Swiss-Prot record:
The keyword Phosphoprotein appears for this protein: yes
Lineage: Viruses, Duplodnaviria, Heunggongvirae, Peploviricota, Herviviricetes
Family the entry assigns: Belongs to the alphaherpesvirinae HHV-1 UL3 family.
Designated name of the protein: Nuclear phosphoprotein UL3 homolog
Statement: the UniProt record of this protein carries the keyword Chloroplast: no
PTMs per UniProt: Phosphorylated.
Compartments where located: Host nucleus
Keyword terms: Host nucleus, Phosphoprotein
GO cellular component, one term: host cell nucleus
Primary localisation category: host cell
Length: 228
């Protein structure tokens, strides 16, 4: 999560009881026939020491093999071989989600991020979705006719997703942080439960890594324009 300098946030530490039995252990004690997944089915996280997965899925594991920076993961790694052989498809393995809650002017914020990424990351091939907005069930039920101060938060939120290749993830991550921290605080507001507004909008950035490559048609991709 990125916030404006000086904005205080709470840090919570959780102490885990290491003596607590696992769920599978408890179920087995109740007579359930449970079997845990073998460690050999798990992939080393972003490692180059080799893959622990067995069988066909271990061949050319995207986490353990070097990535072609220009073209992304080799097409032999793509699960859908029809897409792998089709040059009209671009392959991604990393996803960023930009999220914010109860923000006024949220469309403008994500439009700004999208426009900045298009220009500042022109040498990389990425895919960027439009902004999606979601509301809680409470906000849907209360109706639009009721006016006045709100008694509960609406939990209205936005999400925007950016797909890229793992080799480019550090550049996407750094640029997202830069454009979010460069926001003008008076331009974006968040609404409190009592209806008042504040010029500080927390923006959350989550990063996900895919085990299987995601393929998108090039019509939906912002392609590398460094050569133009």
């Amino acid at each position: 999560m990125y916030k404006r300098p000086g904005h205080k946030h709470l840090s919570i530490s959780i102490i885990m009881d290491t003596n607590t039995p696992s769920v599978l252990t408890v179920l087995a004690s109740w007579g359930w026939n449970c079997a845990s997944s073998s460690p050999a089915t798990q992939c080393l996280e972003r490692s180059t020491q080799g893959c622990l997965r067995e069988g066909p899925s271990a061949q050319g594991c995207d986490y353990c093999e070097p990535v072609n920076v220009e073209n992304g993961p080799p097409t032999t790694f793509v699960k859908n071989q029809d897409h792998a052989k089709n040059q009209e498809y671009t392959h991604f393995d990393t996803l960023f989600m930009v999220s914010s809650i109860d923000e006024l002017g949220r469309r403008q914020l994500t439009d700004t991020i999208r426009r900045d990424l298009r220009h500042s990351l022109a040498k990389f091939t990425i895919a960027c979705t439009k902004t999606s907005s979601f509301s809680s069930s409470y906000a849907t039920r209360k109706g639009r006719k009721k006016k006045g101060p709100r008694t509960q938060p609406s939990n209205k939120s936005l999400q925007m997703f950016i797909l890229c290749r793992r080799a480019h993830a550090k550049h996407i991550r750094a640029q997202l942080q830069a454009v979010i921290q460069a926001r003008k605080p008076r331009k974006y507001y968040t609404r409190a439960i009592d209806g008042s507004t504040h010029p500080v909008v927390p923006v959350f950035v989550y990063e996900f890594a895919a085990i299987d490559t995601v393929s998108l048609h090039r019509d939906n991709v912002i392609v590398d324009s460094s050569g133009s």
